[in-house]
């Protein structure tokens, strides 16, 4: 097999991969826009009718309920809220249901050097995304539509933890204290209920938590990322739930597990008690999408006070240091694609390097060097084969001139020459073949790592974004051109023209790649050129 032909095949493979990526972006945007349009048209009359009844959205323990769940925009401004500020989160919790209606991440500005923080939960018209919770049965217990009271409208964490209580009282004297628990350096928000049964009857109570959101406006991202639902069950199975499939998922019950709404870099997860059996469901209510977790029923005797632990919420980034120990399988929200088994160790190695040198740019360079060292022997064999092919080029050309009209004899003489000179033209294939999964894995690592978001390096201000000055893609293209010149030219003129065009084509592709990935590819090319030049010089001498 001719090495140039193999390079051409690999180039075509990577081109198809990149084109597929681009198609995925367009397809996802079109699909989500169609979903928004269809649900708005179909449900206009339903929305108008349902706004008169706020309680139709409360989850049912026994049957599926496809009714409307919308924030009460008519009265939202009349309902007070309490602001909670921790070291990592700033939340606005509405007194209606004790719903977390807004959440900002303190360590993540929306843009570089901006005072405005990234908002994950929101009650804006353009982005409805809230965490609702309550108690059942409806009518006897406070749901996320019930009005709570709070002693303060502002809480700030000064120590290692903070408890924010909300109080509800029934007409017959039942007292419910809904409490949010916060810990320092944690994006986990705990929810529990302290209930005092002042009646003469035993209370049978079920708690629930649900996430509600619309499909977010697309921001024309060049690189595709997943936005939608996800769940993890007791069989350690992680499953994505596309928005369009929310109504098609059966209601299921299993021990532990969790459900989440995921977007690029950030997510919100409902994590109930890992030792209890919970009921999980998803549904579409007009143009809103719900994930609901209903906990098992508990009893409270007359005159007794009992604390019901509802669920934990994770409201934060896909940062491994924060999610690894929160719940089993939560690290799978970092979408490394089908090559997870390769990408996860690469991510851990990159994080370990960063923990030592504290620069993501230099960490990528060192990781590239380590990958290059791992493939050194394979690459050396490949480069020696290519150098040998380069030396044989004049003799191969002469054979073609002599036996060009007899393909069978030309092939036989060519193989005899390879055997005589102890050169295997296929030996250059393996290193390239092995590195393709590594490249694709690193592509997903650098695309998904929130740690690279707004990470500076040299003149770059954000390694997760394309190079605004196109310097790295141009250097990468030049390095690819130089690398080609070190290889033997293909005998076929058409192949030669295609190979000459590839550096230009890949430079165009890489203009929109994350600059961290382009940095890896550029450094890899430079190291390859150096290694190949040294080997060529040794052989020539």
From Swiss-Prot:
It comes from the Bacteria. The chain crosses the membrane at residues 6-26, 356-376, 430-450, 463-483, 498-518. GO terms for cellular component: plasma membrane. Keywords: Cell inner membrane, Cell membrane, Chaperone, Membrane, Protein transport, Transmembrane, Transmembrane helix, Transport. Its main location: membrane. One of its GO terms (molecular function) is membrane insertase activity. It is a multi-pass membrane protein. It is found in: Cell inner membrane. The keyword Protein transport applies. GO terms for biological process: protein insertion into membrane; protein transport. Interacts with the Sec translocase complex via SecD. Specifically interacts with transmembrane segments of nascent integral membrane proteins during membrane integration. Required for the insertion and/or proper folding and/or complex formation of integral membrane proteins into the membrane. Involved in integration of membrane proteins that insert both dependently and independently of the Sec translocase complex, as well as at least some lipoproteins. Aids folding of multispanning membrane proteins. Belongs to the OXA1/ALB3/YidC family. Type 1 subfamily. HAMAP family: YidC_type1. This is Membrane protein insertase YidC. It comes from Vesicomyosocius okutanii subsp. Calyptogena okutanii (strain HA).
